[in-house]
């Protein structure tokens, strides 16, 4: 007889199927509702949801195992507490002073963002202005033609002024070139170097826009005098150099007025913010008094 029609094997499969059918349990929704209703009537306690496992699981023995060591109930309670604590999310541990914050320190607020944008704009303006004026001074020094009749003290003055002009602008260009890439790389965050290098940013701005421009005016006057003296007409050199004196005075005056107006505007804005904050606090205090007064009268 073929193996597929073996009566003993067929009988064995039937017995196994009947056994599985006997062990199968069927639970309906009505059975669950009935069990819950029965539990409510018997216990009378509110239904507490089972704690779901969260992050950072701990072993059951970690929940206060050092307490109640002497008794069995204490051990059971500790095990239960440890299990419950292992299913809850742990609170983040507070950072101590010894911990090093290696993460990103976040973005700046509005006032600090204004300082960041201002420092970035100052560095960009300093780099452009310094590169332009330093190159112009070097070209003038090289392209000027000098004769034997040119005054030697005048050549010394020209060399000194040109050296100072190029040195000041190169210093400003160096500082702006070194700081600006790191500011653009870090972005408007607390990791930006403008917070600690504010002195160098202001120094670069001072060299490029104040000292550098004044030296550039002096350089133009000396070049005029050298050029017109070389052609035998020093009177034109005197006139053009004299015209630069009121220009320099106006330059210094405008620089002072712009700086003064900027400072006064900043102080005025700060005063307005303080006054607005005081008004807000006064209104809030009056609201609190108005809400507290009726309750006090009722209590009396």
UniProtKB/Swiss-Prot annotation:
A single cellular component GO annotation: membrane
Q: Name one GO molecular function term.
A: store-operated calcium channel activity
InterPro entries the record matches:
CRAC_channel, Orai_sf
Q: Name one Pfam family in it.
A: Orai-1
Task: Show the disulfide pairing.
Answer: none
Where is this protein chiefly located?
Answer: membrane
Extracellular compartment segments: 147-153, 227-237
Q: Does the keyword Membrane apply?
A: yes
Which ranges does the record list as Cytoplasmic topological domains? 1-128, 175-205, 259-300
Q: Which GO terms describe its biological process?
A: store-operated calcium entry
Q: Where in the cell is it found?
A: Membrane
Bilayer topology reads: Multi-pass membrane protein
**Where are its TM segments located?**
129-146, 154-174, 206-226, 238-258
Q: Where is this region: Disordered?
A: 58-82
- Provide the alphabetized UniProt keywords: Membrane, Transmembrane, Transmembrane helix
Ranges of compositional bias, category Gly residues: 62-75
Keyword Transcription applies: no
As for what it does, the entry says: Ca(2+) release-activated Ca(2+)-like (CRAC-like) channel subunit which mediates Ca(2+) influx and increase in Ca(2+)-selective current by synergy with the Ca(2+) sensor, stim-1. Required for Ca(2+) and IP3-dependent contractile activity of sheath cells and the spermatheca. Affects brood size and somatic cell function.
Instruction: Report the sequence similarity comment from the record.
Output: Belongs to the Orai family.
Name of the protein this chain belongs to:
Protein orai
Per the UniProt entry, what species is this protein from, by scientific name? Caenorhabditis briggsae
């Amino acid at each position: 007889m073929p193996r597929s029609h073996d009566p003993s094997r067929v009988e064995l499969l039937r017995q196994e199927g009947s056994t599985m059918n006997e062990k199968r349990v069927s639970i309906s929704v009505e059975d669950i509702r009935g069990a819950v209703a029965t539990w409510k009537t018997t216990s009378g306690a509110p239904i507490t949801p089972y704690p779901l496992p969260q992050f950072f699981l701990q072993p059951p023995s970690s929940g206060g195992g050092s307490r109640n060591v002497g008794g069995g109930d204490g051990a059971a309670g500790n095990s239960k507490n440890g299990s419950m604590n292992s299913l809850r999310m742990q609170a983040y541990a507070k950072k101590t002073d010894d911990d090093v914050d290696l993460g990103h320190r976040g973005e700046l607020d509005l006032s600090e963002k204004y300082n960041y944008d201002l420092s970035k704009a100052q560095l960009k303006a300093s780099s452009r202005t310094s590169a332009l004026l330093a190159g112009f001074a070097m070209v003038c020094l090289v392209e000027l033609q000098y004769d034997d009749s040119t005054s030697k003290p005048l050549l010394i003055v020209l060399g000194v002024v040109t050296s100072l002009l190029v040195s000041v602008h190169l210093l400003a260009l160096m500082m702006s070139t070194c700081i600006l890439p790191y500011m653009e790389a870090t972005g408007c965050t607390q990791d930006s170097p403008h917070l600690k290098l504010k002195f160098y940013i202001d120094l670069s701005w001072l060299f490029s826009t104040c000292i550098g421009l004044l030296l550039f005016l002096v350089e133009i006057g000396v070049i005029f005098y050298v050029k017109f003296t070389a052609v035998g007409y020093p009177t034109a050199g005197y006139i053009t150099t004299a015209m630069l004196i009121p220009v320099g005075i106006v330059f210094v005056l405008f620089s002072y007025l712009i700086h003064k107006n900027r400072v006064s505007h900043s102080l005025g804005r700060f005063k307005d913010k303080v006054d607005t904050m005081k008004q807000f606090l006064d209104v809030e205090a009056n609201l609190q008094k108005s809400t507290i007064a009726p309750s006090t009268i009722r209590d009396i």
